[in-house]
Amino acid sequence: MVKNTIEESVATGRRKQAVSSVRLRPGTGKIDVNGKAFDEYFPLEIQRVTILSPLKVLGYSNDFDLVIRINGGGIQGQVIATRLGLARALLKKNVDSKQELKSHGFLTRDPRKKERKKYGHKKARKSFQFSKR
């Protein structure tokens, strides 16, 4: 199954303000997110598919139990942060899977952040309404 003998691996993923800690251990596929069931915390199918895509690519669909802790951010930021954390945890378990995960873009952290508001502007780039007269 898995080449490395580490029993449990923990990894962190980030996206914008969302920070996700993923604890990966051998099991039957049970997923716990902030004390709730996976389907309850992420009700949309696309969110669940996005998070579990690193497991599916490597062929570990129901081989691991996941305990996920998420803080901050919006739903989509939390989804991408959790996917990154899961991919990093899988990489700790099986170092040989790095090329596979990297080719699908699961190990790349999205560096984009919210741009700060500038003085003299309404938002980061939006100006106040201009009146010619």
Swiss-Prot record:
Keywords associated with the record: Ribonucleoprotein, Ribosomal protein
Disordered: annotated segments: 97-133
Basic and acidic residues bias spans: 97-113
A Gene Ontology molecular function term of the record: structural constituent of ribosome
Start-end of Basic residues biased regions: 114-133
GO cellular component: cytosolic small ribosomal subunit
Entry superkingdom: Bacteria
InterPro entries cross-referenced by the UniProt entry: Ribosomal_Su5_D2-typ_SF, Ribosomal_uS9, Ribosomal_uS9_bac/plastid, Ribosomal_uS9_CS, Ribsml_uS5_D2-typ_fold_subgr
A biological process term (GO) from this entry: translation
Family designation: Belongs to the universal ribosomal protein uS9 family.
Name of the protein in question: Small ribosomal subunit protein uS9
Protein's organism: Chlamydia abortus (strain DSM 27085 / S26/3) (Chlamydophila abortus)
Lineage, highest ranks first: Bacteria, Pseudomonadati, Chlamydiota, Chlamydiia, Chlamydiales
